[in-house]
């Protein structure tokens, strides 16, 4: 059974369709998608290794194949400032699978990125050199602003166009990015022009759980996690005081934390992306779901079909980050995104190639 947010593999040309910045007018009927160029995006984070293949489709893209594996590359990095040998070996094994899948497909273009674990580790560059030697994959370390932009680009379609703003957040393994997006006044759907402010904090589900503990999390420990994250975000929130005071914005989250919350809220027994991606949760439902998770023992979290053993020690740290965001940016609505960096990478490559301005990018 695939557990929410921890599924290893998804195959199928119709698994999911993501809207992009291409034109909306005209019929989306077109030629067979197999004639469209194929793109690949790989995101190596502190906790996960994720690969996505997609083709242009209408004004967006359609996923052909996806691969995701929890590797915990950043395990212990908050204490040692280094990637451990065990974590490196786990990650390289996953990257070998990615390399094999990429080699088996004729790609128009690909982009492979590494984020916080490789940014902050003293041996991050040495690790990527080893990855190149052992897998043939060349990964680039992206800075925090680029990571925030990519997450926003991947989720932009889920922002409510009727609100004055959106607080978009990506809760990662080693860091979390929060972006204020203004309303789209131009119709160009350009991420950078809408980013009024952004911040990246050094707290993700791995780093926060390693600092405070993720197995036995008392309510006092949970409150400490929330307060630590809130303190990091306070000054950022103050710069947006005029926007916050209007209340005319909503939250938009992308991460295993929010997809897990959505699954628990809906009572899912297995992963159903079509029910999670784009799901709206009200403030009371979020609070009730988090309260239920905080009240569980580690064993209860580990055996819950929406969490599983691989995330049982991380999910409460993610909830604490979300609660800190909610304290500073109170909103009646949260929209959940099962998309993010990889989709942002794919949209960027396709946009640069002008695929949505060419004839024949059919549905």
Annotate each language-model stretch with its function:
Residues 36-39, 53-56, 72, 76-105, ...:
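Helical "lid/coupling" subdomains associated with nucleotide-phosphate turnover
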Residues 43-48, 169-175, 254-257, 340:
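A short acidic Gly-Thr/Ser loop motif
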Residues 48, 66, 166, 173-177, ...:
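Broad gene-expression machinery/nucleic-acid interaction feature
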Residues 60-72:
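N-terminal glycine-rich anion-binding loops that anchor highly charged ligand groups
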Residues 34-62:
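N-terminal basic/disordered segments at the start of proteins
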